[in-house]
């Protein structure tokens, strides 16, 4: 797959040249492939939020560059607004940014600013609402009458209605109850499967990352600590733990079984994979 986004030797320093100078991102480099579901994980202060604000030009690099389809997004600063339509960013707790009188108007705000009108705008709004499970009868309600999870869906629909090529989600399930988290992630998985768009999911939850993404980028102290397929990353579980990061609950169980002498792959990260291995061991096989 060809990369749709490329981060090249990115550095961002806050307060440069002052006694309070601090680098939030240092010499980060990685590619994001077209149609990929990429997970980014790291502790608070690891550089996650600063990094993703560079992906659509909300922040300008101190050094390095961001390429969108091979072109530096800052090559023509006057066109940075176009980049923000192509790389949609949903902030943590986006429901706090809702402001219109109705759900419909809130979802319509972004595509209307793109120049959509009439039937084209109406289709964009209703299609985005449908993608995240908002019913037609909810479109004329005030967004402030909705539950927290429903507000989150409205905010997400407002970005989807602009039809971004890349969707960046910053802790999209933060503050939701377990049912709300799973319902929202199901909407996001359906969107990825049906539309084939590139998604970047930022989370502090290894379990959420493990269940959803194709590849993982692990950040620590403003640097990329490791990256790879989930099985490759979780195979380095001890390294993740020693770095103060977490592993999925299933991986933790597998690691403990391995320590107790069970012949099992400690990098498994799904219930199904662990079940297959345990059944294979019970039958005298090797399991995989």
What are these regions, as identified by a protein language model?
Residues 65-82:
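ABC ATPase NBD Q-loop/coupling interface
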Residues 142-146, 150:
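Conserved ABC ATPase signature
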Residues 163:
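Conserved catalytic motifs of ABC-family nucleotide-binding domains
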Residues 167-170:
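Catalytic Walker B motif of ABC-type/P-loop ATPase nucleotide-binding domains
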């Amino acid at each position: 797959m060809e990369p749709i986004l490329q981060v090249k030797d990115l550095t961002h320093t806050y307060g440069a040249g002052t006694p309070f100078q601090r680098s939030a991102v240092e010499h980060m480099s990685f590619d994001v492939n077209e149609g990929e579901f990429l997970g980014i994980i790291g502790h608070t202060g690891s550089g996650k939020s600063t990094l993703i604000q560079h992906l659509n030009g909300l922040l300008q690099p101190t050094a390095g560059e961001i390429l969108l389809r091979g072109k530096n997004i800052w090559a023509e600063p006057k066109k940075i607004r176009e980049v923000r339509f192509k790389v949609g960013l949903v902030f943590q707790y986006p429901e706090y940014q809702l402001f219109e009188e109705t759900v419909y108007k809130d979802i319509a705000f972004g595509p209307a600013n793109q120049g959509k009108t009439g039937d084209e705008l109406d289709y964009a709004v209703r299609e985005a609402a449908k993608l995240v499970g908002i019913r037609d009868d909810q479109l004329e309600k005030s967004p402030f009458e909705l539950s927290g999870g429903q507000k989150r869906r409205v905010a997400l629909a407002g970005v989807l209605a602009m039809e971004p090529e890349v969707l960046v989600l910053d802790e999209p399930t933060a503050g939701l109850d377990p049912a709300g988290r799973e319902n929202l992630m199901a909407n996001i998985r359906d969107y990825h499967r049906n539309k084939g768009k590139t998604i970047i999911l930022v989370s502090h939850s290894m379990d959420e990352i493990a269940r959803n993404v194709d590849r993982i980028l692990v950040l620590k102290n403003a640097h990329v600590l490791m990256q790879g397929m989930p099985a490759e990353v979780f195979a380095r579980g001890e390294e993740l733990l020693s770095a103060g990061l977490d592993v999925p609950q299933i991986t933790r169980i597998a690691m403990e079984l391995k320590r107790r002498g069970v012949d099992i792959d400690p990098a498994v990260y799904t219930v199904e994979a662990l079940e297959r291995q345990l059944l294979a061991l019970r039958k005298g096989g090797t399991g995989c």
